[in-house]
Amino acid sequence: MSSIKERNFFELEWTLSRHNEFLDTFVPQTFIGNHDVTRIATRIGQSNAILAAAILFTVGGTPSIYYGDEQGFTGLKEDNVFGDDAIRPPLPAEFSPLGTWIENIYKALIALRRQHPWLYQAHTEVLEIANEAMTYKSVGLGGEELTVHLDLEEVSVRILDGEKVLFQYS
């Protein structure tokens, strides 16, 4: 999510436009982290990682979570023989209570996604944009809509169905 790290939602607008083109042909697997890159919480911080997760769960595609991201795991990928060790730690038998707040947010976003199954084919349309703030709507094939407000200055996200707030973080 370089658009969050670089504080440039115009980059995200371009990416979502390209993503819409993919959705015209197939439903892509979407992710914000994987086993080959520095962890999202390390790249953009834990609070900003929540904004990235909100995007992941409100755009078209099949969202995937890299284990530990839902707990805010950190890890820097390095360019050496053991460079993947920090991003691929053993999964603990029990999660730390320190990551519970992030896990609860992920659970809420997953629940929102499950309540709106049409999102997997949703196209996005940017309604308002500035470098550090963006509002877009995700529109399903049947005309269903959710509106997403992202703000990097306040580090906040709101997801609405019409006037009803479905999710809020700040």
In which residue ranges do the predicted regions lie?
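Conserved alpha/beta catalytic core and glycan-binding cleft of carbohydrate-active enzymes
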Residues: 1-82, 89, 151-152, 157
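Carbohydrate-interacting/catalytic domains
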Residues: 60-65, 69-170
